[in-house]
Amino acid sequence: FHGFGLGVSVHGPLCLKVETILVPEFDGKRFPKMMKTYKPQAIAGVPTLWSAMLENKGFDNIDLSNLKYVISGGDYLTLSMEERMNRFLRTHGANISISKGYGMTESTAATSYTFSGTNEPGSIGIPMIGNKFCICKPETEEELPFGEEGEICVCGPTVMQGYLNRPEETANVLRKHKDGNTWLHTGDIGYIAPNGVIYFTQRLKRMIVSSGFNVYPNVIEELIEKHPDVAKCCVVGIPHPYKVKVAKAFIVLKEGKEENPKLRKEIKELCKNNLEAFSVPREYEFRDTLPKTLYSKVDYKQLEEEEKEKAESKEK
């Protein structure tokens, strides 16, 4: 199961006596027809759902003014995707902005949300009632000041008691701080602004260390997705003989667009002109699709495994 899908799309609405329309398996062709037939007031989904909506011509003439809430969660929503989705909603009659939340199954789904006045671009809002957030220096319990990036930690009544029969993993993520409370160390990087609004920037596990420099895949992905011909991008670390790892970008183009030398050069120049030298991808690969997990997230681990196998085969 997935905490976001159950908590936001099933449990929450049912507690409020709201009709819930269950879609057992997402079908891009049927989705526009379902939206037109049922006219839901709210939809919740992961970023790949918004990508599908943006690229689906079936939505060209559909009025979405019935929508009051569009909630994104389950995975990182890039700033460029957020901006594109907001334009899409307004051009289809929905005078709203996409809402974001943050949470994980270990904290029983959502722990923060972009309540009114906190839905700033790129933010994940403020803590939900009963929850507390702090930012710690990664791998420690040392709390950091406002504006400084570190590991997002959550404390509250919805945080799990632990992983069943996995004491070592439990001790690694549930840690007691100086305030005497037990905090969930999420493995995600972010910061809290002086006004209390929280920002998620990167999953700690996805960070690429290249020649001692920290390379953040989502920063590169967000930049490449700003190119008008790019639909989706995923960046992973690939083995390098002396830098240990370097970045490689996997790119999916929008419908009707094809890879060509001019486009490849434009994307390379975009990266060179806007990124630190150590963050610029060493390789670019264009694909028709990207692998997905069971929860429709981009499966970056599969891409990493593919690259690892390639490197190992070259060494033989």
PLM features per residue range, with description:
Residues 35-36, 43, 156, 161-162, ...:
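AMP-binding/adenylate-forming catalytic core of the ANL superfamily
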Residues 134-153, 176, 194-195, 258-264, ...:
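Conserved beta-loop-beta connector loops within the AMP-binding
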